[in-house]
């Protein structure tokens, strides 16, 4: 009632009078204090104070934290100190040399080709030379490589080569010239969306691999965030999410906020909730995550996405073409992971892994075209005409798209279900046996094809070195120290799993004869990298690896653990 409202206002009148009295006193004090200054001085001080506030704000509120920038500056200054700096440079130089010496792929018996041949070679001669190069490849056919090659069957290879040949000269940049290729790509996207239970509005693009698929999703959500007025869009992702998200943040001027994992290696949903801010542009889940092969709880994270109206990307690059067939293969997953989950707005899945397409093929999917639109680039003002491309590349190899389509059509649902059944059966067998080997343990509860190992009794990198000496290839992991092995269709062949377990047991037994021995070779290099506080040093040393990929100079090779040369 009006009368009641007036009574309430009168109750506050004494407090308003007190507030007015204090504000008048404050105003008079400031005016009196400023009388000794000239107007130009007041203006100058106001400008300087404003600039100082802006400078402090920009110093503190940057994509990279103040503490991180302080550490970088500190380490940079330390490296410039005469004695300490020289010592660090000596150690860095030694680490670089050790890294080069322990790269078996640099061992070549013949000279590099450094100039074009004066006369072109005939077809037979070119193919013969190529066979020399392919003979350098490791023994992946024996099933000793972690991941890398997901099928490799000769008949499938022949099909993919023929499919590529049909579209060798085609380019999806020119759909008017290659309409058949456009149809192939559209069908790949639609088939993949259907596998992940996308609705009629779902859509996507074919990319060159999982990294590009992730980059495209991040680019889309960055542009969406910028449109909403977010100046520094943030990616909130688990610590285990792929490094491609760091790459996207680096490329696109975003900030990545890493969220801690629980003991079972799943993302801590409550920690993710606390990490959400007004700058959050996207949330991330992995199915599974690369390091430990553990599935993140997509439904729980999706609830956060819906509540805070934030896009959620599910990274299924590694296991995408396993998880969609798990139920029909007799290994149903506990939780949904695809577009059936409200809040999931995009998914990435690599067709060149368990889709058995050739390398250079992946799909990024969206629940609705409104998200994909932000992925596109359109240059409307170029003299060469309107330039529009769906992903990073302009020209793309049509042969890869054709071969991807061929793989999908060749396997069909029944083929993928059978392949999934064989892989998961092998992975579960290995998991159960590894759990019973003393002195090592498995991280989390991997449900798919990746098994990560650790040890409380010895440096786990020694196990990788020992297995490497037996011809096996593991992936080194860090934070915490661990190694993993990724099971593919190659490992389902007869006796591969049995030999794997035999070599693991022998290696662990050998290591436990002297569990405190130091790691050598690549294991020592990875151990040093994890222990180094200055991560810029690690990046500097790691760049040597990339430089070595392009070297055409002979390199002297070192030894693996215990002086055992890695077999060719």
From Swiss-Prot:
Its cofactor is pyridoxal 5'-phosphate. Residues 62-568 are cytoplasmic. Disruption phenotype: Mutant animals have a shortened lifespan. Mutant mice show an increase of sphingoid base phosphates, but also other sphingolipids (including sphingosine, ceramide, and sphingomyelin) in the serum and/or liver, resulting in changes in the levels of serum and liver lipids not directly within the sphingolipid pathway, including phospholipids, triacyglycerol, diacylglycerol, and cholesterol. They are deficient in B and T lymphocytes yet have high blood levels of neutrophils and monocytes along with elevated expression of pro-inflammatory cytokines. The modification Phosphoserine is found at residue 564. Its main location: endoplasmic reticulum. It is a single-pass type III membrane protein. The chain crosses the membrane at residues 41-61. The modification N6-acetyllysine is found at residue 353. One of its GO terms (molecular function) is sphinganine-1-phosphate aldolase activity. Pathway: Lipid metabolism; sphingolipid metabolism. It catalyses: sphinganine 1-phosphate = hexadecanal + phosphoethanolamine; sphing-4-enine 1-phosphate = (2E)-hexadecenal + phosphoethanolamine. The modification 3'-nitrotyrosine is found at residues 356, 366. Signal peptide: none annotated. It is found in: Endoplasmic reticulum membrane. The modification N6-(pyridoxal phosphate)lysine is found at residue 353. Its EC number is 4.1.2.27. GO terms for biological process: androgen metabolic process; apoptotic signaling pathway; ceramide metabolic process; estrogen metabolic process; face morphogenesis; fatty acid metabolic process; female gonad development; fibroblast migration. GO terms for cellular component: endoplasmic reticulum; endoplasmic reticulum membrane. Keywords: Acetylation, Apoptosis, Endoplasmic reticulum, Lipid metabolism, Lyase, Membrane, Nitration, Phosphoprotein, Pyridoxal phosphate, Signal-anchor, Sphingolipid metabolism, Transmembrane, Transmembrane helix. Highest levels are found in liver, small intestine and thymus, followed by kidney, lung, heart, spleen and brain (at protein level). Also detected in stomach, testis and skeletal muscle (at protein level). Residues 1-40 are lumenal. Belongs to the group II decarboxylase family. Sphingosine-1-phosphate lyase subfamily. Cleaves phosphorylated sphingoid bases (PSBs), such as sphingosine-1-phosphate, into fatty aldehydes and phosphoethanolamine. Elevates stress-induced ceramide production and apoptosis. Required for global lipid homeostasis in liver and cholesterol homeostasis in fibroblasts. Involved in the regulation of pro-inflammatory response and neutrophil trafficking. Modulates neuronal autophagy via phosphoethanolamine production which regulates accumulation of aggregate-prone proteins such as APP. Seems to play a role in establishing neuronal contact sites and axonal maintenance. This is Sphingosine-1-phosphate lyase 1. It comes from Mus musculus (Mouse).
